[in-house]
Amino acid sequence: MRQILITLSILLFSSLVFSSEKKLGNITYSNGANYKGELKDGIPNGLGFLSLPDGGKYVGEFKEGIINGQGTVTLSDGLKYSGEFKDGKKHGQGIYTYPTGEKYVGEFKDGKKHGQGTWTFSDGR
């Protein structure tokens, strides 16, 4: 009986561990967005690439289907943010680069510039 319980415990544990492994895959969303990258239980988790129908794109980390960690988002108009994300929003250190050549390097909180930062104009000032 003890041998059976040990065997069942090992099988149950190994199935839980292996069922949640990351795999590579593609997801096409109903709005036309397309995700390619690591999946855990069929959800973006880890490194991935998200292309949007309007031409925007995101390359970076996902956690449980949400943008989290380091990444870069580039919009179709050329606006670019590279830095930290939390719960799908810019949060932490990052760099905003505008199509005009202007740049903001600094802190973000809840998707907005917040805290210390440096603004550089397109002429270098």
Question: Predicted segment positions?
Answer:
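Positively charged n-region of N-terminal signal peptides that target proteins for export
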Residues: M1-I4
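Intrinsically disordered, low-complexity repeat/linker tracts enriched for polar/charged residues
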Residues: L24, Y29, L47, Q70, ...
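N-terminal segments that cap or nucleate solenoid repeat domains
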Residues: S19-D54
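Cleavable N-terminal signal peptides
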Residues: I6-T7, V17-F18
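Conserved anchor residues at repeat-unit boundaries in beta-strand-based tandem repeats, strongest
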Residues: N34-N45, K57-N68, K80-H91, K103-H114, ...
